[in-house]
Amino acid sequence: MRLHCIVEDVDTARVAAEGGATVIQLRLKGVPTLAVVEAGRPVAALCRKSNAAFVVNDDVEAALALNADGVHLGRGDEGKELARAAGLMLGISATSIYEAIAAAEQGATYIGAGPIWETPTKPDAGSAIGLDGLAAICEAVKVPVVAIGGVDASNARDCIAAGAKGVAVVRASKDASEVRAAVDAAKTF
């Protein structure tokens, strides 16, 4: 759970794996399931070789076809029951204590909380919750929380100090080794 790197291609996944990613999440928004499966095959193989967990974003069917370790779903996405029944690790996004509690009740294996800070990667993510919002979510649920949104090597340690069990990065995936070093340096793990 320490370092989730969210990627769109195998080249970025490779850099993330070499940098110490513990989870590599393939996120291809608006892409049909068959295309996700095709793009995901080399990423899944890379994850198996590097011992990183492989998670597919928003597509339970693709996750199952790729024999992924898990799937990450948004609050309103369907497929949570299928993911749980299939034994997949289930990540669910949350932007508030209420949403985090609901995610835990829906069987989340982990909660992606954020955005912690504003991020250009996902302009529709809503208002930043900050470290105080992250800490409140971490205190409200027993499920591990992964901080996302504007996280990089300069602030990953702050997320861990606020109670997160890990951080998720998109833009910083190419700097995974620096983010991993910052996360590992946190004494609150």
What is each of the regions a protein language model found here?
Residues K29, W117-T119:
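A short, flexible beta-alpha/helix-coil linker loop
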Residues T121-P123:
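Glycine/threonine-rich flexible loop motifs
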